[in-house]
UniProtKB/Swiss-Prot annotation:
The keyword Lyase does not apply. Gene3D superfamilies: Syd protein. The keyword Cell inner membrane applies. It is found in: Cell inner membrane. The gene is syd. Its main location: membrane. Belongs to the Syd family. One of its GO terms (cellular component) is cytoplasmic side of plasma membrane. This is Protein Syd. It comes from Shewanella loihica (strain ATCC BAA-1088 / PV-4).
Length: 220
């Protein structure tokens, strides 16, 4: 059992919900990106038919993905719930319903995504420091993506944050409590559409978030 048991339980409920309603595992468009999550029956589709969706199953890593590179680069200690949330599994994004709306939780699809995620976490925190705002770590989005779901590093509480602004609404006292309040949302996979983005030397928070979603959901 990990230090974030609600996440373990949510994965169990998530896959069960898809099995009960659709008779199969959740689907995702990997766009040619390999992952240990892809079910064996769909492995050939990843390369042979990259435009097709595949069934996936969350895979727990043998050991938790390390975050010491982030802590060293930023001279900061990450809240342990962040490490448990991002470092324990490879999975596709998780769709959810809740009393505060629908949304998605971000998860790394493979090791390359995990490493890219770390780069974006560093960029997000550097921008927070530039704005002289408390450190937060993004974990997903609400609705159409105009609002981020973030964990406050000092307390571990979960908030809604609009990019460039301070968190403005607390949703839960901990990431454990937050995930425990969610319900799996069964829905067909949506094929990502990449929108062109202008290149900038110092992209803002929202641009960084868009880049993150482009790489981790839309794929390169």
């Amino acid at each position: 059992m990990s230090s974030l048991p609600a996440l373990d339980q949510f994965f169990t409920l998530y896959h069960q919900a898809y099995s009960d309603k659709l008779g199969e595992s959740p689907r995702y468009f990997p766009l040619g990106e390999a992952s240990p999550c892809v079910l064996e029956c769909d492995q050939e589709k990843v390369d042979a038919s990259p435009e097709r969706s595949v069934q996936w199953q969350a895979v727990k890593r043998d050991s938790q993905g390390p975050f010491d590179n982030i802590e060293h680069a930023l001279s900061i200690t990450l809240h342990p719930s962040i490490q448990a949330f991002y470092g324990r599994y490879f999975a596709a994004p998780l769709m959810f319903e809740s009393e505060f709306g629908e949304g998605e939780l971000l998860q790394p699809w493979n090791q390359q995504d995990f490493e890219y995620l770390q780069q974006n976490l560093i960029g997000h925190l550097m921008m927070k420091q530039k704005l002289k705002q408390p450190a937060t770590w993004f974990i997903g989005v609400l609705g159409e993506g105009d609002e981020m779901l973030v964990v406050e590093n000092e307390t571990g509480s979960v908030w809604i944050e609009i990019p460039g602004e301070q968190p403005h609404r607390q949703l839960a006292a901990s990431l454990e409590d937050f995930i425990a309040s969610l319900r799996p949302r069964v829905c067909p996979p949506q094929k990502p559409v990449e929108a062109p983005m202008p290149e900038t030397d110092h992209p803002g928070i929202w641009q960084r978030l868009k880049t993150m979603w482009r790489h981790l959901i839309a794929k390169r």
